[in-house]
Every structure is written in structure tokens, then in C-alpha cells.
């Protein structure tokens, strides 16, 4: 009934297994990949013919983490998996980026890759297992896929690269100073296709070494997928890349010179209008048959690419006339919004970001319910890309995959320089509103985010800047590396290489390669050129701000205090009664954790002090021999009970009230009367013993009144 094919190798410290033929047999390709006890099922299906009029490749990658994989029940009202989490969206993009360029050009059949996490051992992150499973499923599916690829994660600790570090070591690098890198690399047998990383000011050489280590480490996995395919692959789908060479020559003859003139226009919107006019002019000179050719749009795009690429490689000339290593003009401004906690407007050429920082308290932390546990994040970065930023009227709604991915890239770049939570107990939310875009808006978010946080008073370890690099690589091996690429250079080039960091080193690196043949020499040169660009941008940013400014008067102030853990119950009170009273009386927000760390937040310093004093009076212990002011709360035959230390009561025995004999305490005391008392000590049962007779009741000083 089943035709099961199973292959396995020892990979790092775990066994990697690939299995097909047992489940999802109606899919074009189905593979379950298992690393340790983490298992991911990848299923591939593709249409056998394209939809009419389709002018792009409709590839969809889905990644879903099932809660049952870790023995958990989903939260929420419906108790089932719903919309994709940020992790699921980012992982889907992580898988999509290296496989998309490897489909045969011209293939426009609808293709679906679905990755489902079936089991999670809480040690091995399922994202890389999913990438391997997806690659294996594509390889055996018969789809025109020029893989396989494989991926791995690399850490960097004590100068050593670590293959597939445990998930607990990687999910919060800011609080794990020994681990300085979280790098994901995907590639084929011969080339690196994709890099994604979060780093702690690593040098260019260290980053390049990590990429090489990763590419070497995935070779056994690629061999394993090939071994599986030799026994389980389906017949290749009969698809030939369309030959539109004659059509392209006709398009080139009709429009190359005019297209070159159009691409000499520096203004983006004018250039786009001119390019559109050239395309329409080309179409007017084509035959009816050529106009109906489904490859016409591809031929026109190839004409654009040819013009741009030849100018870069042969003439060293770019669309806007810049040198290959030249950064566009930069204007950095801070304090652009009066009521926000911190704001910056970062403009680089025709790319602009309005970035705003808001400071919050512990109540504002983001709660994350992940397969490997629940945790909180006190740094949030949200990236918004409205249609008007590119002069279009389009969809407005919740963030898409691209916005989530760009936001996470900027988050990785900036979180490495944030102060420790113990030194800066605030929740920081950064929002990047892209108001203009012509390439590298995510890096504008990094620069603007750094400026905005410093404007808000966040004591960053160092300013951070980012730059997007591009590459044009010709068949003869000649190439040009571009600094600070425009949107057209991104779309028509062979590599998108984003690097962010401080003067000391790299904090984030993202690379997407569309072609094979990117050598280590090219990558090394690109990183060095990116460093020069980054340092230039940092110098321009320094004209606006170089260090954390003063807090906005509208931002909350937070004071922290540590109390003994056995006092937490007293501060909270029965049903939260005490802490609610503190909040109501003081007007401050009060947050307490299981370690006894209390955060008191308010824009008003007096509110913070009042809450601090109230908490201190609850948790502090009265000192023997000290004098305190108190209030008589109850009179009995043998003395008086005095409330003298917050809510603490003690007994003043009748013999300790005055230096003379009293018939009854009520002879000299009444309930509600304020008195001065001295703490004599505690009896065997811990009861407080107080005295009045040795304290001057007028001055509160030691020594009875005459």
C-alpha cells in the first residue's frame, strides 16, 4: 500500500531524516523532515497549466506551527490555530526567498508549498527543518525546480561558529551576551542564495566566515535530498523555458536608444512616465502577432534590464548619475512631532521615513505565545508602507508579509544596541511610516529608528545605520557593486544586499541572490563597500544627533525598587486590594514580578515618590531603638495599640506610657491621637513592644518632657 522511501544522516549533533511515500500521496511532492524530535511535513502542488494572462510566477509558501506539536492547546476563545503569527510569516518568507529564483524562468503555473510543524522537541527550531522539507518536496515533485537547496542556522560563541544552536540560546540574544550571532543561510550545492542574520557588532570578516561555514555545513543535506530524489522523484514536468529571442531583438531594435534616454532621467516619477512611453512606442512598431505574444512583457522587462546593466558594468554609470559607491543626499531631522516621545524624519534621495518612538511600561510589553514557551518582548518595531509612498492608489489594511519582514529586519538591526532592561526598564515601540520610497526603505527605517530613539532619550550603545547594496553580474564574469540602490536597480539587478550596523560592526545582514556565481571575492568586496557606505551615513546622521537626548515631558518616568520575595503578597494584598489602593492614591502605574522587582511609572515625579513611599512603608522593617510617629487605634485596660509604621501596629503597655502610675490608659490617651513612640523590640511571638515615656511628645526627640 505504501511505497516508503527514507534517508537519514548524522548532521551536527542530531540525526536528520527525510521520508516520503507514507502521507499526502496525492500531493505532487510530500516529505517529512525530522531533526532530533522536531518534524515538519512539506507538501508541494502545482497547476499543470498557467492561467491565461498570467505575467508573474504565482508561488505561495505557507508555514504553520501546530500547537499539538509541542503538546499545547491554543489560547484565545476559539482554541484553534488562526491567522499566521509573526514567526510563521517570517519563516514562510525565509523559505520563499531562496526557492523562488530557482524555478525555470517563464514558469507561471500556480504553485503551493505548505509546511506544517507536526512535532517540536523544544530544542531544534522547526524553521530550518521546514526549509529542508520544502526543498526535498520540490525536488521530488517533478516541478521545474533547479534545486535542491538546504538551509541551516549558525551561532557564534567564544570565537567559534556553532551549527544549529538550541532554540533557547537564540530567541533572545540581547539577554544572552555569550551568543553574538543568529545567522540563517540557504544555498545550493554551488552557491549561497539567501542570508538573514541578527548580530552583535561582528566584523565583516566574521560575518563572511559564518556564511562560508554555513554553506559548507549544508552540503551533506543537499546530498541527502539528491539521494532521496534518485529513489523517489516523479517524472519531470514537461516544461521548456519560452524562447522569445526573436521578439526581444525586435523590441531591442525598436526601443533600446529611447529606453537608454529614459533611464537617464533622475527623477523617479518622470523616469517611470518616460519608460512607460517608450514601451508604448515599442508596441506601436510591433506586428499583431508580436503584440499577442505572451512573452511581450518579459521582453520589455529584459530590455530595461539590459540597458541598466550595460550602463553599470561597461560605463560605471547609474540611473541617477551617481558613482557605483556613492550614497544619495541625506537629510536627518529630529523633534519633528511635538507631542510624541521621540521622532525623526530621515530622507535619503527619494526615500523617506517618518519614525516615531514611544516609551511605555511593563504593562505595554508584547506577550508572545510560541511553541517553545511564552515570553514577553519590550522592544517593538512596526513598519508601514502606504500606497502614497510610491505615488499609487492601492490596498490599505493590516500589514502584509513584506511589511512584517521589513519591520523585523529593522528590529534586528536596532535591538543589538538597546540598553539592558535592568538599566532602562521601559517598553520601546518604534513605528516607521514610509512617506516616500525609491529603494531601501527598510534601511531608512533603521536610520530613522536610531535617530528617533535617541531623540526619545533611549541610551543606545551606539547609533546604527543601514545601507542597501546591489549587484550586476554579467555572463563573462564582469560585475558592478552598487551602494544605496534605487528601486529599479533592486528589481533589475542580481543581488539585494542589506547591511546595518554601528561604527564597530554589523548588527544585521540580509542578502537575496537571484543568480549563481556570486563568489566569495564578490561578497567580500560588497561587504567592504557597504561598510564605507554605512560609515558615511552615520556621519551624516551625526549632524542631527549623536547621543540620547532628554526625556519628553509627555513620556512616563519609571523607577525600580527591589523587595524581598516574601513581601510580594503584602504589597499586592488580598485580591489585589493593597496594590490597587497604591495606584489610586498615588496615580502611578505599579508593576511587580515574581523576583520582587517593582516598576513604578508616571509622567509625574510626585506620583512616583508617593507610590514608592507607600510600598516602602509596607515592606520595610521597623528598627529597634528608633522613634516613630504613630496614631492610637485602640485602647485597652493594659495599654494602647498604636499604628506607627505603615499598617503595622504595636502595643504600648500602660507602664510605658508615662513615668508615673496611671489608673487607665484613657486617662491620657484617646483613639485617633497622634503620639511619638520608641520601638523597644519584639517579644517571643514577634509582637511589637513600644514605649512613649522616654520620648518627648512635643518634639519627638528622645527624653521625656519636663
From Swiss-Prot:
GO cellular component: cytosol
Stored SUPFAM superfamilies: Eukaryotic type KH-domain (KH-domain type I), Nucleic acid-binding proteins, Polynucleotide phosphorylase/guanosine pentaphosphate synthase (PNPase/GPSI), domain 3, Ribonuclease PH domain 2-like, Ribosomal protein S5 domain 2-like
InterPro entries (alphabetical): ExoRNase_PH_dom1, ExoRNase_PH_dom2, ExoRNase_PH_dom2_sf, KH_dom, KH_dom_type_1, KH_dom_type_1_sf, NA-bd_OB-fold, PNPase
Gene3D superfamilies in UniProt: GHMP Kinase, N-terminal domain (3.30.230.70), K Homology domain, type 1 (3.30.1370.10), Nucleic acid-binding proteins (2.40.50.140)
Pfam families: KH_1, PNPase, RNase_PH, RNase_PH_C, S1
Keywords tagged on the record: Cytoplasm, Magnesium, Metal-binding, Nucleotidyltransferase, RNA-binding, Transferase
Location of the protein in the cell: Cytoplasm
Cofactor(s) essential for the protein: Mg(2+)
EC numbers, comma separated: 2.7.7.8
Catalytic activity: RNA(n+1) + phosphate = RNA(n) + a ribonucleoside 5'-diphosphate
Any single GO BP term: RNA processing
Limits of the S1 motif domain: 625-693
GO molecular function: 3'-5'-RNA exonuclease activity; magnesium ion binding; polyribonucleotide nucleotidyltransferase activity; RNA binding
Family as reported in the entry's similarity comment: Belongs to the polyribonucleotide nucleotidyltransferase family.
The name this protein goes by in its record: Polyribonucleotide nucleotidyltransferase
Species name: Jannaschia sp. (strain CCS1)
Amino acid at each position: 500500500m505504501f511505497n516508503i522511501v527514507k534517508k537519514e544522516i548524522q548532521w551536527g549533533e542530531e540525526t536528520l531524516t527525510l521520508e516520503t511515500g507514507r502521507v499526502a500521496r496525492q500531493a505532487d511532492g510530500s516529505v517529512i523532515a525530522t531533526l532530533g524530535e522536531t518534524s515538519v511535513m512539506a507538501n508541494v502542488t502545482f497547476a499543470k497549466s498557467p492561467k491565461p494572462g498570467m505575467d508573474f510566477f504565482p508561488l505561495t509558501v505557507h508555514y504553520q506551527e501546530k500547537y499539538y506539536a509541542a503538546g499545547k492547546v491554543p489560547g484565545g476563545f476559539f482554541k484553534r490555530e488562526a491567522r499566521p503569527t509573526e514567526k510563521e510569516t517570517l519563516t514562510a518568507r525565509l523559505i520563499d526567498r531562496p526557492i523562488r529564483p530557482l524555478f525555470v524562468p517563464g514558469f507561471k503555473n500556480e504553485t503551493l508549498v505548505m509546511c506544517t510543524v507536526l512535532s517540536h522537541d523544544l530544542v531544534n527550531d522547526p524553521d530550518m527543518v521546514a526549509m529542508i522539507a520544502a526543498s526535498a518536496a520540490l525536488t521530488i515533485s517533478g516541478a521545474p525546480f533547479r534545486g535542491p537547496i538546504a538551509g541551516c542556522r549558525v551561532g557564534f560563541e567564544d570565537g567559534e561558529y556553532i551549527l544549529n544552536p538550541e532554540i533557547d540560546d537564540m530567541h533572545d540574544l540581547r539577554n544572552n551576551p555569550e551568543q553574538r550571532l543568529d545567522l540563517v543561510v540557504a544555498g545550493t550545492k554551488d552557491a549561497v542564495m539567501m542570508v538573514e542574520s541578527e548580530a552583535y557588532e561582528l566584523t565583516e570578516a566574521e560575518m563572511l566566515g559564518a556564511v562560508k561555514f554555513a554553506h559548507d555545513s549544508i552540503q551533506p543535506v543537499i546530498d541527502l535530498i539528491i539521494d532521496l530524489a534518485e529513489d523517489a522523484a516523479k517524472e519531470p514536468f514537461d516544461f521548456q523555458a519560452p524562447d522569445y529571442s526573436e521578439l526581444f531583438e525586435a523590441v531591442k531594435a525598436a526601443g533600446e536608444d529611447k529606453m537608454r534616454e529614459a533611464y537617464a532621467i533622475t527623477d523617479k516619477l518622470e523616469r517611470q512616465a518616460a519608460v512607460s512611453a517608450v514601451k508604448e512606442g515599442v508596441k506601436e512598431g510591433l506586428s499583431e502577432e508580436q503584440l499577442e505574444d505572451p512573452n511581450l512583457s518579459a521582453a520589455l522587462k529584459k530590455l530595461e534590464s539590459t540597458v541598466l546593466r550595460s550602463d553599470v558594468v561597461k560605463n560605471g554609470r547609474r540611473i541617477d548619475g551617481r558613482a557605483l559607491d556613492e550614497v544619495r543626499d541625506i537629510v536627518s531631522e529630529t523633534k519633528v512631532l511635538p507631542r510624541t516621545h521621540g521622532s525623526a524624519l530621515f530622507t535619503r534621495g527619494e526615500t523617506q521615513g517618518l519614525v516615531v518612538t514611544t516609551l511605555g511600561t511593563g504593562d505595554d510589553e508584547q506577550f508572545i505565545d510560541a511553541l517553545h514557551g511564552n515570553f514577553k518582548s519590550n522592544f517593538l518595531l512596526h513598519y508601514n508602507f502606504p500606497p502614497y509612498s510610491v505615488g499609487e492608489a492601492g490596498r490599505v489594511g493590516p500589514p502584509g508579509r513584506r511589511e512584517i519582514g521589513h519591520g523585523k529586519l529593522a528590529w534586528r538591526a536596532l535591538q543589538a544596541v538597546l540598553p539592558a532592561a535592568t538599566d532602562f526598564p521601559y517598553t520601546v515601540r518604534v513605528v516607521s511610516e514610509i512617506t516616500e520610497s525609491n529603494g531601501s526603505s527598510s534601511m531608512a527605517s533603521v536610520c530613522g529608528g536610531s535617530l528617533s530613539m535617541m531623540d526619545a532619550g533611549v541610551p543606545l550603545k551606539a547609533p546604527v545605520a543601514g545601507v542597501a547594496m546591489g549587484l550586476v553580474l554579467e555572463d563573462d564574469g564582469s560585475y558592478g557593486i552598487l551602494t544605496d540602490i534605487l528601486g529599479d536597480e533592486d528589481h533589475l539587478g542580481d543581488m539585494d544586499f542589506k547591511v546595518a550596523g554601528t561604527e564597530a560592526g554589523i548588527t544585521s545582514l540580509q542578502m537575496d541572490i537571484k543568480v549563481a556565481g556570486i563568489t566569495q571575492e564578490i561578497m567580500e568586496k560588497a561587504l567592504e563597500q557597504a561598510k564605507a557606505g554605512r560609515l558615511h551615513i552615520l556621519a551624516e546622521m551625526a549632524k542631527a544627533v549623536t547621543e540620547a537626548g532628554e526625556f519628553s515631558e509627555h513620556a512616563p518616568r519609571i523607577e525600580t525598587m527591589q523587595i524581598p520575595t516574601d513581601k510580594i503578597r503584602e504589597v499586592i494584598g488580598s485580591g489585589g486590594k493593597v496594590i490597587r489602593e497604591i495606584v489610586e492614591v498615588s496615580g502611578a502605574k505599579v508593576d511587580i514580578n515574581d523576583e520582587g522587582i517593582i516598576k513604578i511609572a508616571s509622567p509625574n515625579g510626585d506620583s512616583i515618590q508617593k507610590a514608592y513611599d507607600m510600598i516602602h512603608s509596607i515592606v520595610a522593617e521597623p528598627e529597634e531603638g528608633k522613634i516613630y510617629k504613630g496614631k492610637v487605634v485602640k485602647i485597652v485596660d493594659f495599654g494602647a495599640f498604636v499604628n506607627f509604621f505603615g499598617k503595622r501596629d504595636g502595643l504600648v503597655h500602660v507602664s510605658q506610657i508615662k513615668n508615673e502610675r496611671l489608673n487607665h490608659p484613657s486617662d491620657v490617651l484617646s483613639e485617633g491621637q497622634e503620639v511619638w513612640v520608641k520601638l523597644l523590640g519584639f517579644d517571643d511571638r514577634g509582637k511589637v513592644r513600644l514605649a512613649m515615656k522616654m520620648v518627648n511628645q512635643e518634639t519627638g526627640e528622645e527624653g521625656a518632657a519636663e
